[in-house]
Amino acid sequence: MPTISRFLGIVIAMFHDDHGYPHFHARHAEGEAKIRIDNLEVIDSTLPRRQLRFVLAWAELHQDELSENWQRARAGETLKDIEPLR
C-alpha cells in the first residue's frame, strides 16, 4: 500500500488493486479509516474524532490530487506524494 502523505502521526495510503468506489486509507496508532474521494464520505473508521477531522480537512484540500492518484493506481502507475496538512 503506497503511502501518499503523512502528517500528525497519520499515514495516508492507497492500494493499487483496490476495488469499489474511489477511496483512500488513513492509519494512525489509535485507529484507521477508509474514506471515499468523490464525496469524502467516511466508509469505515476507528480513528479518534480529532484525527478523523484532520484527515477530512486534508482530503478536502487535496480532493483533485486524490482523484488523480486513484486513476494512477487503477492504471498501475506510480502514485504522487501529496502535501501534508500544515
Which residue ranges define each predicted feature?
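Basic nucleic-acid-binding interfaces
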Residues: 1-86
